[in-house]
């Protein structure tokens, strides 16, 4: 019997192992999730968010205004202020440029049209944060100077302001249509003693914004006074007086519309109608609770959970609905259109949000992602281009790239296809083939020369990534010629890489921009310096590694990035914030960098840096966001990273694994499935990954695929306090690599004076030392470059590279001979 006992024991273990594992339980709420949202996060520092009431992706943002201008007043509110000018119905969240603040109302005790910003008597009032409350869908504050309590709540296109006046005080409501933006035209119509309507057309970031409104007072006004007696024009203000013997409370129901006054009326009638303030608030908060339940987390740290759900909230207040309840909207041609098939949106901050916010939406907002893309294509029909940064039917001309393209490609390759795919691909190619914003030079040379366009390095790099996403969609559609064209363009990053410095650097047609300082903020980069753009090759990290000279070189450059001095030189750039060395988390070009360590077999360094950013650069305080929140992008980084992964390369269908922050998190998908993430033993100390299991199987890979998430299941991390060997094998690291249709990079002049006295010696080089260089002087026959040569007269030098029968673009540079008696002195810091 003894000799059979080990066999029986082994059989028992085997049978036990064969039993189906119990499913991993989903994360559970321990309270209302809206209780974890702190809308004041981001209202201080440079976050540029607002605390007022709004609905998920809603048209109305009903919020207090404490600032009339200034960079830190972009949202209309800053936590450091102690005076309120009033409560307006539209606001931007986290942007770096001001706009909105439309249709200001302010309850007060006297008829006064001056806002008080000039220090003279006005309708503004002091307030204290001790008597201020902000929740999803609700805001309340006490106005100290007039002893009035104000409460705000909203539906999607309408809202209610409720004022509680003190006993016996005079009851006055000021309507200011001149507030903040330059007014192009405005009008106020008195329909009855309880209803008024009108419009305001204004100019700021949006150069021709049109907004209509309709207001219903809960009791009739007894008198109305107009500034200078005017009800039309650029300075329309009105004061409405009410009988204070008929109760201390006045509510104002407001509907807004980009279409017309009828639209504004229908919007509030259908959304609010006869509902009470409390009913509207309750409905708003129930909708917010349902939205936040898309991801449920468990953890012991209250601040971390507050940061998470506030981040969820911030990713859901833009883009904004831009059509009335009847489907009508104002298009990019400023004409009125109608759609019944999808919701039409505005406020697409795509240079920011294509990186993480839109990838997050492909997980938790797939239906809305279809609406976003249908909106892009409709704007393409109306205005001739897809949005870059659109605002209220206006093109702002702000930011770079054509980042509607990766949003579409990412969605399409993830199976989100509720739109006209052929039109989408046509619009994507149209974005890439225009001759504006440096694209003409980019197509001709394979890069944008400094002398041709500002922000040339950033544009070259971002265009190259966008082109890669077009190539991926072309490949999926079987469009081989387009695939080749755009895959070649995706490699144009090679033409702005300087092998001597290992940085991405501005170049004239044939020569590098000099002198070069990677710390310098100048016109070659977008809101950044070379440190902050030199790692931007998400589409071909392997190719970038080859340029640098190997994985150890990329690792070394990343190490230097995070320990470099955190000062910049050159132009002062307010956007460069949240610095760890030269890593600038407060601005988007840095957002993928910490995850690049996974590509060089050092995932523990990604885990260290990601956890540092999560816990140091996001806090439960008004200044708890380290830069402009940027319409959800800063928050989306936090959400994805705290779950344990990030979208380094949208359209690759991969998320790179970092360091999960919570014990358990469940993503409740629109398809009815749940994906649960468990981090066993996670703590502030235990930030390193020991092992990972995906659906019960060992997962040695330092990335996860999108299909694994949307299929439902579980991802289990075992965390520890020391770096491990997990994810370090070459077979298990993420790879993005362009392997076919390889280009020949454009040669450059490594030595030689473009303007010279006597003569100059010219040395040519290429990023690829194995390619051949050919040159021609003054249209003579091309010669193989074999070494430095002299130029002693004015000459036109043409060069190109060649390898394996492929040629680079031909680039021409004119050399000028200077009179030796002429002296040139440059007096510029650039």
PLM features: residue spans?
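Surface beta-strand/loop "capping" patches
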Residues: 653-677, 744-764
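Short strand-turn-strand beta-turns centered on an Asx-Gly dipeptide
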Residues: 670, 694-697, 777-779
């Amino acid at each position: 019997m003894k000799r059979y006992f080990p066999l029986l024991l082994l059989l028992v273990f085997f049978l036990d192992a064969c039993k189906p594992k119990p499913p991993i339980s989903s994360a559970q709420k321990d309270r209302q999730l809206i209780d974890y949202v702190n809308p004041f996060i981001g209202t201080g520092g440079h976050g540029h968010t607002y605390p007022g009431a709004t609905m998920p992706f809603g048209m109305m943002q009903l919020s207090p205004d404490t600032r009339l201008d200034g960079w830190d007043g972009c949202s209309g509110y800053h936590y450091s202020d102690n005076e309120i000018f009033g409560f307006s119905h539209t606001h931007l969240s986290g942007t770096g440029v001001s706009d909105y603040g439309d249709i200001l109302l302010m309850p007060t005790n006297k008829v006064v049209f001056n806002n008080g910003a000039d220090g003279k008597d006005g309708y503004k009032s002091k307030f204290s944060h001790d008597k201020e409350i902000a929740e999803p869908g609700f805001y309340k504050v006490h106005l100290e100077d007039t002893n009035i309590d104000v409460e705000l709540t909203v539906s999607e296109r309408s809202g209610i302001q409720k004022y509680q006046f003190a006993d016996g005080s005079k009851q006055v409501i000021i309507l200011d249509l001149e507030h903040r933006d330059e007014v192009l035209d405005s009008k106020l119509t008195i329909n009855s003693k309880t209803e008024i309507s009108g419009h305001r057309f204004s100019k700021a970031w949006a150069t021709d914004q049109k907004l209509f409104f309709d207001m219903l007072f809960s009791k009739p006004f007894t008198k109305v006074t107009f500034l200078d007696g005017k009800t039309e024009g650029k300075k329309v203000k009105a004061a409405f007086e009410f009988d204070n013997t008929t109760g201390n409370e006045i509510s104002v129901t407001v509907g807004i519309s980009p279409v017309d006054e009828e639209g504004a009326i229908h919007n509030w009638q259908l959304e609010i109608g006869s509902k009470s303030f409390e009913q509207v608030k309750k409905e708003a908060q129930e909708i917010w609770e349902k939205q936040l339940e898309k991801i449920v987390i468990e953890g012991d740290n209250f601040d971390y959970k507050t940061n998470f759900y506030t981040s969820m909230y911030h990713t859901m207040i833009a883009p904004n609905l831009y059509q009335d309840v009847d489907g009508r909207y104002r298009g990019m041609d400023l004409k009125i259109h109608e759609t019944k098939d999808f919701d039409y949106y505005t406020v697409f901050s795509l240079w920011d949000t294509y990186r993480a916010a839109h990838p997050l939406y492909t997980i938790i907002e797939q239906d809305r992602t279809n609406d976003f893309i249908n909106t892009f294509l409709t704007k393409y029909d109306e205005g001739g281009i897809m949005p870059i940064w659109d605002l209220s039917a206006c093109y702002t001309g702000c930011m770079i790239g054509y980042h509607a393209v990766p949003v579409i490609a990412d969605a399409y390759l993830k199976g989100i296809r509720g739109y006209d795919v052929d039109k989408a691909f046509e619009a994507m190619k149209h974005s890439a083939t225009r001759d504006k914003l440096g694209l003409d030079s980019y197509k001709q040379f394979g890069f944008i020369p400094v002398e041709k366009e500002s922000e040339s390095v950033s544009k070259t790099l971002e265009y190259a990534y966008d082109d890669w996403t077009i190539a991926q969609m072309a490949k999926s559609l079987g469009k081989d010629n387009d695939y080749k064209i755009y895959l070649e363009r995706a490699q144009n990053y090679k033409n702005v890489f300087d092998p001597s410095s290992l940085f991405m650097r501005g170049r004239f047609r044939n020569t590098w921009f000099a002198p070069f300082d990677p710390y310098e903020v100048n016109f070659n980069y977008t809101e950044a310096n070379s440190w902050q753009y030199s790692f931007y090759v998400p589409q071909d990290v392997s190719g970038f590694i080859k340029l640098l000279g190997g994985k150890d070189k990329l690792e070394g450059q990343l190490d230097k990035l995070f320990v470099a001095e955190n000062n910049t030189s050159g132009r002062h750039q307010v956007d460069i914030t949240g610095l760890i060395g030269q890593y600038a988390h407060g601005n988007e070009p840095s957002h993928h960098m910490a995850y690049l360590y996974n590509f060089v077999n050092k995932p523990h360094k990604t885990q260290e840096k990601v956890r540092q950013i999560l816990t140091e650069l996001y806090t439960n305080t008004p200044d708890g966001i380290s830069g402009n929140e940027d319409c959800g992008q800063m928050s989306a980084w936090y959400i994805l990273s705290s779950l344990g992964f990030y979208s380094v390369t949208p359209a690759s269908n991969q998320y790179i694994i970092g360091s999960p922050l919570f014990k358990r998190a469940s993503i409740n998908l629109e398809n009815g499935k749940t994906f649960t993430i468990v981090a066993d033993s996670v703590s502030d100390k235990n930030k390193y990954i020991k092992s990972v299991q995906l659906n019960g199987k060992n997962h040695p890979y330092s990335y996860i695929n999108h299909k694994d998430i949307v299929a439902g299941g579980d991802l289990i991390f075992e965390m520890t306090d020391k770096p491990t060997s997990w994810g370090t094998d070459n077979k298990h690291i993420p790879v993005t690599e362009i392997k076919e249709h390889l280009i020949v990079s454009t040669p450059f002049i490594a030595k030689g004076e473009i303007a010279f006295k006597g003569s100059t010696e010219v040395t040519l080089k290429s990023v690829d030392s194995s390619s051949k260089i050919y040159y021609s002087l003054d249209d003579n026959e091309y010669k193989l470059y074999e070494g430095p040569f002299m130029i002693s007269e004015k000459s036109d030098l043409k060069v190109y590279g060649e390898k394996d029968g492929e040629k680079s673009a031909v680039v021409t540079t004119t050399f000028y001979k200077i009179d030796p008696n002429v002296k040139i002195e440059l007096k510029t810091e650039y």
